[in-house]
Amino acid sequence: YRGLRALGIEINLFTHDEKHATPDACFPNNWHTLRDGKLKLFPMKDENRRLERREDIIEFLKHKHPNLVVDDSLLRYERQDPPKFLEGTGSLVVDHEERVAYVALSERAHEEVVAEHCAAENLTPITFKALDARGRPIYHTNVMMSVCSSVAIVCADSIADPADRRRVLDALA
């Protein structure tokens, strides 16, 4: 924090007190993205994660960026029976240059929500199932892969289906 400020980077710090009951609030990338003048809100599986979408933070962003468009169209999936989710850039690993979204499908990343988001953002979805060393689903894609401008890091062995693994690796090549 201090190092960034020393470099002249403006930081707006929002604290999450115990009263907020949001222990995972240090991961705001799961409930929103900010890109091209749009604040996109994502449906979250756990109720305490939904509490992170604080109105004071959203209002601050709207005040700071008067032309900001708030897109909450995906939040309706939280209210469906059964509910469906897509936890932001925890679930979505986006290659912005190639316009591809890699998504490990899980209880926190439902294919229907992925398809709608990708269509709206002009992204090609590449979905797959990923498992940890004990055979449990990996719930956020960003724990098993990352895509940067000139390099990608992926734990290919976690992609359960060999055909899916090949599809992901080919897309990254």
Q: What do these predicted ranges mean?
A:
Residues 1-173:
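The feature marks the mature, well-folded catalytic cores of soluble enzymes
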